[in-house]
Amino acid sequence: MSILKVVAERLVIHPHPNADALELAEVGRLRAVVAKDAFRTGDHAVYLPEGSVLPEPLIAELGLTGRLAGANKDRITAVRLRGELSQGIVCRPKALADLDLAAAAAAGTDFAEVLGVTKWVPPIPVHLAGDMHPAEDLLPWLDVENIRRYPAMFTPGEPVVATEKIHGSACLMTLVAATGTVFASSKGFGKQRLAIKEADGNLYWRAIRAYDLPRLAAAVAADLGAARVGVFGEVYGRGVQDLGYGVQASTRPGYAVFDVAVDVDGEIRWLTPDEVAAFTAAHDVPAVPVLYRGPYDEAKLAELAEGVETVSGTGANIREGLVVRPATERYSPVTAGRTIGKLVSTAYLTRKGGTEYE
């Protein structure tokens, strides 16, 4: 899940092909359905992204009482409106009526706090939870931004690697090389430097043991001279999320490495896709499928994000999407951090009965 920012954006307005009273407001590569003539191309408005949780007064102001997602009907999700995918909400809240939204857009002003908008945090089911303890040496995972939201993240033609995005639960494992200490955590707890105590029934620990991840991390540490190694992988299967990939997690959970980070002389470095592939193959640990290597082509990658999964080899369910990285790690001024983005399939966004646990 990405970082929540509520900012003003310059809009490009398109006709809605199926409704005379509606139009499509484009933000980046995302589009949100709006009332006809509410905005013109070049106007600036506030964009409330997917995953935003809105306060009741703002929901009422927007005329959306009872129409949003979640138990409290307060969460923005992707929906189809008259056949067109609508992602996020474009609006001009009364609380910002006196502001110059064009200037705010140029400054990148974040209105989340002013508007009372918060980020939705996925619930943690019992089989993923456990007793927690502080773990300052734990290497956390980061937020992956939506490429359609930030299309300038990659340069056309730059060498990239795209892997399949698996719908499971991210398992963070850190090995401290000097002591052999192993920490396990989730995305959310990892950000707080909290680890889950080892337990037979915990899904993360079951995956760590089943795939002998400490052995992989120890080999990486030895080869690269790392003090700490973070192995980041997706635990998946029936019982983890709604997409099962033909695996019954209650017997042996599915698992695939999607990233590895090392601490060498106090500097954190993310391994390149080729390095991750080499280490996982050498130690018989599954890795997420690589679906594309080559020059960055947004249209081609967006098409590749659709379809069925390739993890099981049987096309057991829809594909969640892609995660795209440069072939060589680099800094992104767009995200002010690591260059890594995702493209999520339309089928995944609009599926019915989906689960979104951490």
Task: Provide a role label for each language-model segment.
Residues 1-358:
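Core nucleotide-handling region used for phosphoryl-transfer chemistry
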